[in-house]
């Protein structure tokens, strides 16, 4: 039998939407753990698997109840009822996503594969609303946003009681700037309760009774919080300087863009005026050419008409001659003499050739 440690990570996200106040708040609780997988000889042993599944389900259920209780007592102290009731908010959605990674321990061995979990990630997403939902969904984009984050390290097991220690606690305000609080602020935000990292708390509804007089403030957590805050301060200063430099460069780019836009606008106006003038000249020229063409067309039509009249007169004259006996005798006599002389010349030329 082989003992393998696996990384376990559970994320609980509670989203509270208030339509009347036009805001929503997200509370995110991250739970980290490093557990050894349950030991049994073969994965095909159904009884061992069933026993482990039942134990795992009890552990997960107890952890979820504790997280609900933590959120309710921290942000809804005056709320009564079950752990799933947060004041007058109504639950509208629950989404659970699990990701489990297993490896085959007998990869290089013959026989049936032996799988062991090496990674387990789970995300629980709860949405609560109150008030009247707007008809236009785009109005929700104008809501104010805020976010609270709690990171918790889980130790022990269900038999020994669920032991946990808070690693850090911070909020993301509406401006979007991360602010890591000091340990005293962390303690105050957790319902004013100080919890000892070594305190043993069972997974029942009265789990807070064991945490009321405990102490959250360990030396390691305090130093970690202050060091984290100092690092964030340096990072924010550097980020602010870089942001100022970027803003200065962006302003220069904006000025350059404005100048370019002004130049482009002037060029566009000049080109438009030039195009208008050109179109006016072209239009005038076109009208003049059109007038000249019309005059030429009229003259051509007049000439055609005159030619047509002359042709008609010629036809009428020919018809008249045809009706009166053809051409005059003088015309025939001239043509007869012409062709007679030509015939005589050709005949004499032919005789001389022989």
UniProtKB/Swiss-Prot annotation:
Residues 309-333 are annotated as: Disordered. It is found in: Virion. This is Uncharacterized protein R692. It comes from Acanthamoeba polyphaga mimivirus. One of its GO terms (cellular component) is virion component. The lineage of its organism: Viruses, Varidnaviria, Bamfordvirae, Nucleocytoviricota, Megaviricetes. Keywords: Coiled coil, Virion. It comes from the Viruses. Residues 326-353 form a coiled coil.
